[in-house]
A protein has these predicted regions:
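Bacterial N-terminal signal peptides that target proteins for export
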Residues: 1-11
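Residue-level signal for mature regions of secreted extracellular proteins and peptides
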Residues: 15-16
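N-terminal capping segments
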Residues: 25-147
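Short, solvent-exposed loop/turn and secondary-structure capping segments
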Residues: 60-63, 148-151, 203-204, 242-244
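Low-complexity, Gly/Ser/Thr/Pro-rich intrinsically disordered linker/tail segments
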Residues: 235-275
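...with weaker cross-activation on analogous glycine-rich loops/strands in unrelated enzymes
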Residues: 152-237
Length: 275
């Protein structure tokens, strides 16, 4: 525990130094592309973009290794809010709060009297991964019922639920799976990649292993066109980040580089057309 706290103190101090540097102005948000006839899609896009705004609009192209600037440590409260959405959340929140309190005590003891307060680096809360909790949170904020999109701390488990709904009732399923090379994502859809050592390359492969954990990542598509698929995801380099993926002339996401997790499914959001 003492070693962990020491590492946390070092990260907190390093984060403070990074935040003191000059930051380039954030890019403008994507222009909303969801029509009034698709209020459910619009609500999900709005929820994702609102969270992105809270984090300072970090934006990257493709698959960088680091962000241009570490997000503010005050975003810690946002991470806790995402965890509150999923069943596994209370235990994670309790551990985070205990660690946070211990770090704050250590920082208070290290700083001279009258020095500005230093908060623990946001990167400390990247584990356990909260990207699925983020997607669950924005779904809840958009008013998507839990029986339609079951909140989960693991992408693979809500992916299983969406695939099961599609398999049993394709006409009425709220999310329809598509092969990424066959379907151009639209705002309000989900685009998912498999981060496993031996990844899936098609959603049909997942049907053979329901309930088995796989490290995955899904983002909410917020804009498309112009040779890009723009999507917002959580815990991307420790933050809520808008990523711009290259797309072909038809708007379909191009395959990631060979050393990056492959896209294996795009879930078409049909919340506005199903009941």
């Amino acid at each position: 525990m003492r070693g962990w706290i020491g590492r946390g103190l070092a990260l907190a101090m390093a984060g403070a130094a990074l935040l003191s540097g000059c930051a380039s102005p954030p890019p403008p948000p994507p222009v909303p592309q969801v029509s009034a006839e698709a209020p459910q899609r619009a609500a999900l896009v709005r929820a994702a973009l609102e969270e992105w705004e809270r984090w300072g609009r970090p934006t990257v192209d493709g698959w960088p290794e680091v962000l241009p600037q570490e997000p503010a440590p005050e975003n810690y409260s946002n991470v806790l809010a995402y965890w509150e959405t999923v069943p596994e959340g209370p235990a994670v929140i309790q551990r985070h709060q205990q660690t946070h309190d211990a770090l704050m005590t250590g920082l208070m003891e290290m700083l001279p009297v009258g020095a500005p307060q230093v908060l623990p680096s946001i990167s400390l809360w990247s584990h356990p991964a909260w990207s699925a909790a983020f997607v669950s949170y924005v779904m809840q904020r958009a008013g998507v019922p839990g029986f339609v999109f079951p909140p989960s701390a693991a992408h693979s488990f809500y992916v299983d639920a969406l695939l099961a709904n599609w398999s049993s009732y394709p006409e009425g399923a709220a999310f329809r799976p598509h092969a990424p090379h066959e379907y151009a994502p639209r705002p309000g859809d989900l685009i998912c990649a498999d981060r496993s050592i031996s990844p899936l390359y098609g959603w049909e492969e997942r049907l053979a292993e329901p309930g088995q954990f796989r490290p995955m990542h899904c983002d909410v598509v917020v804009a498309s066109g112009g040779g890009l698929v723009q999507a917002v995801g959580g815990n991307v380099l420790g933050a809520v980040v808008l990523r711009r993926f290259p797309a072909d002339a038809a708007g379909r996401a191009l395959p990631p580089p060979w050393d990056k997790p492959p896209f294996f499914v795009v879930f078409e959001n049909r919340l506005d057309t199903t009941r």
